[in-house]
């Protein structure tokens, strides 16, 4: 229907729908499937930081279709999305640089990269993304942002100001950083849409009382980023109600 931009499911239905989509998509490569399982063994409040198997399949297909030569990922976590990009660029042999400030998570990711023979094209860098970005040179055809949400605008401004995004490149801005209250919700919804809180502040009443005010602040931050991205005259911006909400940015 034209007036519906996304399907509506209850939180209880989301897991089943995700599993159905994965079942009816091409099988995930062994490396991605195995790292999804490794990630699922983490505590529930950590697991929600990782892309779902269905999202990994989409990231792979996006990389396969766009054929990037170089990929920059801000936010590695356990390396699930990194491996999805690796598998999606086997034909093009894309160079992948992934950045994360957590030594613990990078060790988990690097172990997986070695186990699956992916170190030939993946370079990991540890440190805060805003400190690492100035040290990165060259252009990237695909930039994937999945790190600290309060820094989304700063990441995007730096990428554009320093032309890290190639002329025909695509920047995908996905969900943000970990908040300990995630485990209250079955779906991974921390995103540029913030489960609708960016457009309907009354939704906050569904949250535990002690986090309502902080989450309204988070919604304000996400709205600030969304408005900034839309108003930057240098780029074309499309916000897609896909998974947790994905903003796609390209040069005009």
Curated annotation (Swiss-Prot):
Its EC number is 2.1.1.-. GO terms for molecular function: metal ion binding; O-methyltransferase activity; S-adenosylmethionine-dependent methyltransferase activity. Pathway: Secondary metabolite biosynthesis. Keywords: Metal-binding, Methyltransferase, S-adenosyl-L-methionine, Transferase. GO terms for biological process: methylation. The keyword Methyltransferase applies. Hancockiamide D displays potent cytotoxic activity against murine myeloma NS-1 cells, suggesting a potential antitumour application. More interestingly, hancockiamide C, the likely end metabolite of the hkm pathway, shows potent Arabidopsis thaliana seed anti-germination activity, but is inactive against the monocot Eragrostis tef seed, suggesting that it could be a herbicidal lead targeting monocots. The herbicidal activity of hancockiamide C could be due to its phenylpropanoid-like structural features, which may act on the plant lignan pathways, and hence warrants further investigations. S-adenosyl-L-methionine binds at residues 73, 75-76, 81, 100. It comes from the Eukaryota. Belongs to the class I-like SAM-binding methyltransferase superfamily. Cation-dependent O-methyltransferase family. O-methyltransferase; part of the gene cluster that mediates the biosynthesis of hancockiamides, an unusual new family of N-cinnamoylated piperazines. The NRPS hkm10 and the NmrA-like reductase hkm9 are proposed to convert two molecules of L-Phe to the intermediary piperazine called xenocockiamide A. Xenocockiamide A is then converted to hancockiamide D via a series of hydroxylations and O-methylations. This is O-methyltransferase hkm8. It comes from Aspergillus hancockii. The lineage of its organism: Eukaryota, Fungi, Dikarya, Ascomycota, Pezizomycotina.
């Amino acid at each position: 229907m034209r007036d519906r931009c996304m399907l509506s499911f209850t939180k209880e239905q989301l897991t089943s729908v995700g599993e159905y989509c994965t079942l009816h998509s091409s099988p995930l490569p062994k490396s991605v499937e195995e790292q999804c399982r490794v990630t699922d063994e983490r505590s529930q409040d950590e697991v929600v930081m990782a892309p779902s198997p269905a999202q990994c399949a989409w990231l792979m297909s996006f990389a396969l279709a766009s054929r990037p030569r170089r990929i920059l990922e801000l936010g590695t976590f356990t390396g699930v999305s990194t491996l999805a990009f690796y598998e999606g660029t086997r034909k093009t042999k894309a160079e992948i640089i992934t950045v994360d400030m957590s030594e613990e998570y990078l060790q988990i990711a690097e172990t997986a990269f070695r186990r699956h023979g992916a170190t030939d094209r993946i370079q990991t860098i540890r440190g805060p993304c805003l400190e690492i970005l100035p040290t990165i040179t060259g252009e990237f055809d695909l930039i994937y942002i999945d790190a600290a949400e309060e820094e989304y605008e700063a990441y995007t401004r730096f990428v554009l100001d320093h032309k890290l995004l190639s002329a025909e490149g695509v920047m995908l801005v996905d969900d943000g950083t970990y908040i300990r209250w995630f485990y209250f919700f079955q779906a991974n919804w921390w995103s540029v849409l913030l489960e609708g809180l960016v457009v309907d502040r009354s939704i906050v009443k569904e949250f535990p009382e002690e986090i309502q005010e902080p989450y309204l602040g988070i919604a304000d931050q996400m709205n600030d980023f969304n408005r900034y991205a839309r108003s930057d005259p240098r780029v074309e911006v499309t916000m897609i109600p896909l998974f947790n909400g994905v903003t796609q940015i390209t040069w005009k």
